[in-house]
Amino acid sequence: MRLRRKSTLKRLAIIGLDCAEPSLLFERFASDLPTFTRLREQGVWGKLESVIPAITVPAWSCMMSGQDPGALGIYGFRNRFDYSYDRLITADGDAVTVPRLWDILSQHGKTSIVLNVPGTYPPRPLRGKMMSCFLTPDANAAYTYPPSLQVDLQAQFGDYPFDARDFRTPAKDRLLQQITTMTRTHFEVARYLAARNDWDFFVSVEIGLDRIHHAFWRYMDNTHRHYESNSPYADVIFEYYRLLDAEIASLLNVIGDDSAIMIVSDHGGQKMDGGICLNEWLIAEGYLTLAPPYSETPTKLQALNVDWTATKAWGEGGYYGRLFLNISGREPQGTVVPEHASALLNEISAKLSSLGNENGQPIQTRCFRPETLYPVANGIPPDLLIYFGNLAWRSIGTVGWNQIHLLENDTGPDDANHAQHGVLIFNFPGLQPHSEPLPGAHLLQIAPTVVDFFGLDIPETMRYPVLSAK
């Protein structure tokens, strides 16, 4: 059964929660989250598999377009600009060249309100209103369409907090206050715009949950290697989920009962056990060669003297690992013959997959080739995408540690990494409730489901089917 609306139902609202974790939302905290639980019990729900890589950028743009990272040519926050060794660019909204849901709906006369969706700075024209995302530099930037909306919001709410800046900080009290205030403001603005505008499609994404997970996971998880018992922050994540539950309830009161409601996340969250120093490992294995002088302190690879004539591969840090081959005829000083590239990637993948933790115990690292993930890989994809410990370990790109395993993050305190599955709740009047979770739902099914909800033809670029339930 396709999850289609009644003919009398005209509107759909998506509430996005960056990094919402199903084991917390559906299990551990569920009995204390009446709004989430009601929507779940009266609708369909389940885990939502993310794209690879399961990263905020590009996952939200993938969800809103129904196209994978290869089609977008976006493989993370920073992507190679060209085949030089050091030019990386941030993938903001200008990097997204495919139509997203509000673009498609605008073409069919539908009005959208788009708030805080990652990948929307700078904002673009649409039929409706848009406020850009956490990539907005500050409140002095042009962050709305139409521009007059910014004047209105500035008068009503003052400077808008797009993100909790510097969330990798030991100043936990300040950060918690910042995230809480930001989230309340986000929902206050969402209610204001939802109530004062006619719309067909509404989407708002809250980034605060991701920041809370990264900053406070160790205090609630007694399996975390840095768990602190009896911490004053033990209930911070729980209380934040309760805050979201209450704020969503207030937003739903404004939206009303005549709309379909979808709650989604771009990925889940899990404890982070540490980091794998990818470039240190490549040096130790003979794939990456540095020329003197050597760094005695952790340093970005781009700032070091790499002997590219003796280097076969290098990597980038982040929540997942990205490895690039130094291919002859592609990179300026390439050393790997193109015909040998596949065998070399197989060799490196096998070694990385067998790499254990600091005690040699298996961690289940997974390596992916872009040609096996995506029908088309636009832009410059990594030659290898690496999930260290299935994302329980992050990738460390800096060099100078003289070790492979780090038990802390190299860019500041960080307790959590992403997980491959986020959450999905879909609820609208007339929908038959499902007590069991919807199996096999994928992030790339969201866009075609929304297009289908409005009775429009699904674009051929959306390869995944509409969500369905038995």
Whereabouts are the PLM-identified features?
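Secreted, luminal/periplasmic, and some membrane-associated catalytic domains
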Residues: 3-8, 17, 24, 31, ...
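A long, amphipathic alpha-helix that forms part
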Residues: 5-6, 176-202, 212, 218-263, ...
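Active-site-proximal alpha/beta segments of enzymes that process anionic O-linked groups
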Residues: 9, 22-199, 207-214, 446, ...
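Structural motif
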Residues: 14, 201-205, 262, 425
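Glycine- and acidic
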Residues: 21, 171-176, 226-236, 429-435
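Generic recognition of well-ordered alpha-helical segments
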Residues: 35, 347-354, 423, 445-453
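Low-complexity, glycine/alanine/valine/leucine- and proline-rich hydrophobic stretches
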Residues: 388-447
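C-terminal beta-strand edge segments of enzyme domains
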Residues: 420-422, 456-470
